[in-house]
Curated annotation (Swiss-Prot):
The name this protein goes by in its record: Oligoribonuclease
GO cellular component labels: cytoplasm
InterPro entries attached to this UniProt entry: Exonuclease_RNaseT/DNA_pol3, Oligoribonuclease, RNaseH-like_sf, RNaseH_sf
SMART domains, sorted: EXOIII
Superkingdom classification of source: Bacteria
Active site: Y129
Major enzyme class: hydrolase
Subcellular location(s) per record: Cytoplasm
Organism of origin: Serratia proteamaculans (strain 568)
Entry's family note: Belongs to the oligoribonuclease family.
Gene (UniProt): orn
Keywords: Cytoplasm, Exonuclease, Hydrolase, Nuclease
Gene Ontology biological-process entries: DNA metabolic process
Amino acid sequence: MTGNENNLIWIDLEMTGLDPERDRIIEIATLVTDANLNILAEGPVIAVHQSDEQLGLMDDWNVRTHTGSGLVERVKASQYDDHAAELATIAFLQQWVPAGKSPICGNSVGQDRRFLFRYMPELEAYFHYRYLDVSTLKELARRWKPEILSGFKKQGTHQAMDDIRESVGELAYYREHFIQL
């Protein structure tokens, strides 16, 4: 399959923290939707191996969250380094979307893109330069139509694929209740 240039690539990363100069990617997941937000395919969910030393730099929130979800153990056992995870993700995306066509889609994807630029530059370059950031709509709704915010509840598992599915659902919710298309 050569892919459709109107398909959208959704991504979520879990990291050891928020600073790409110090912290590392520990999980990556992607999925592809069509332009109407129908999920076409889910990509690999990859725990990215990091050293015990790197994992030891996590703050309490990250230790609690990623240990509780089982991600820390998956990271320790993973055979994927940054580059292998990057290549596996690109191989999946090439089946669905031509390079340079899809904006990077998700929640707070500016943060994800900072980590991709540092640790997975080939994957970062696969995206169009634009962003489709659901958190922008959330912030606008909070200011302009706060009564709709309670209509969409996230589970908050902080597992990459769960978070992406929620982002797609959240955008569909805002499309109906905020943008009203």
